[in-house]
Amino acid sequence: MTKIVSVAEVLQGRTAIGEKVTVRGWVRTRRDSKAGLSFLAVYDGSCFDPIQAIINNDIVNYESEVLRLTTGCSVIVTGTVSKSPAEGQAVELQAETVEVVGWVEDPDTYPMAAKRHSIEYLREVAHLRPRTNIIGAVARVRHCLAQAIHRFFNEQGFYWVATPLITASDTEGAGEMFRVSTLDLENLPRDDKGAVDFSQDFFGKESFLTVSGQLNGETYACALSKVYTFGPTFRAENSNTTRHLAEFWMVEPEVAFATLADNAKLAEDMLKYVFNAVLKERMDDLKFFEKHIDKDVINRLERFVASDFAQIDYTDAIDVLLKSGKKFEFPVSWGIDLSSEHERYLAEEHFKSPVVVKNYPKDIKAFYMRLNEDGKTVAAMDVLAPGIGEIIGGSQREERLDVLDARMAEMGLNPEDYWWYRDLRKYGTVPHSGFGLGFERLIVYVTGLQNIREVIPFPRTPRNANF
């Protein structure tokens, strides 16, 4: 039985010259020479490059099948690993047999024929786009980053916690939540006041898809000390932009006894760890992005990993922006939420490095962020990266029940909706901190792609839930 190997194993020298192996994959291209040879480029997704298989015209199905192979056909090729005289690849496969597993029915209408396609077109055939160089590379980078995140937290002594995707109406920002219901829309039950009677719904109350696992994560941090969630979150924002998805993945660590300074250090360590991992493990894919998407991709990651993070208070950041002499589209004044142009000015022009902005005005931040002694600001932080702006948002959480209750009253929230969250402050409360990282935004940063819809397999956006 011949050893079955991946294309990556052969190209990375993990098989010996002269060894007989079997490779299984799909045809990227076929070239025929006048000397009675065919050259098949076969890929299996295990790495960026396909392997070249050299096929002599004396194999039994050469005329009947090999010469009919087109882009996308699936094949099993058995042959001997040999040194390649051609440039660009150290080894190739001298084929002894080529078994055709699946044909492309009509090569002329195959959506992934070997020409270049626009990114917009590829979204329309999202079920086939993983076969392209660009989306294949994204998928491998996405996997590498996800694995690195899990590895980082595991090495740091964190526990991964699965927080619920379906939550009751006790999460902030209910206006941008997707409702989960099994009620008959043609015949909705009503209460005495004519409002929809959600007590008759599946969960006996209004329920939604989660916008964050943070509050649930805090409950576990207050028992296991260091936890993180990594899963899908949902926002019903009607934003048709290159930066927004209705369904995306979030990484949310939560740490007991941690201050805002600890939180900023954790964010810096995590980002540098995962960027180092992708530089080490996926250089083949990064070189593709560097050549075709953004020539600064690799340099940007290497600079990020080597740089010290700057830190600045929000109030000082406002001063920097006011004194910059730049005319911003959104005017700068104390109390505004920083827009993307402000964030990028700070990271790219002023500090020329990643920067942590901290201690934001309480009126633009969530109720659970710890109130500072000045009574005007909260212990919040954003990590801003050159080239994209905000990449992480987090805070030290409010551990004092009386202050938490006062903040909730200020914001018109019903404390009864948060009874379980308030309990954490009643029974052995501790200072604790955490942050949220939008995973797709991280992948955009790593790949240099301009649109977040390219970095998730099946993007969910307003008016679009195909596949």
UniProtKB/Swiss-Prot annotation:
**What is the annotated quaternary arrangement, including any partners?**
Homodimer.
Please give the biological process terms from Gene Ontology that the record holds. Answer: asparaginyl-tRNA aminoacylation
The kind of enzyme this is, by top-level EC class, is ligase
Q: Which family does it belong to?
A: Belongs to the class-II aminoacyl-tRNA synthetase family.
State the name under which the record lists this protein. Answer: Asparagine--tRNA ligase
UniProt-listed InterPro entries:
Aa-tRNA-synt_II (IPR004364), aa-tRNA-synth_II (IPR006195), aa-tRNA-synth_II/BPL/LPL (IPR045864), Asn-tRNA-ligase (IPR004522), Asp/Asn-tRNA-synth_IIb (IPR002312), NA-bd_OB-fold (IPR012340), NA-bd_OB_tRNA (IPR004365)
Which reactions appear under catalytic activity for this entry? tRNA(Asn) + L-asparagine + ATP = L-asparaginyl-tRNA(Asn) + AMP + diphosphate + H(+)
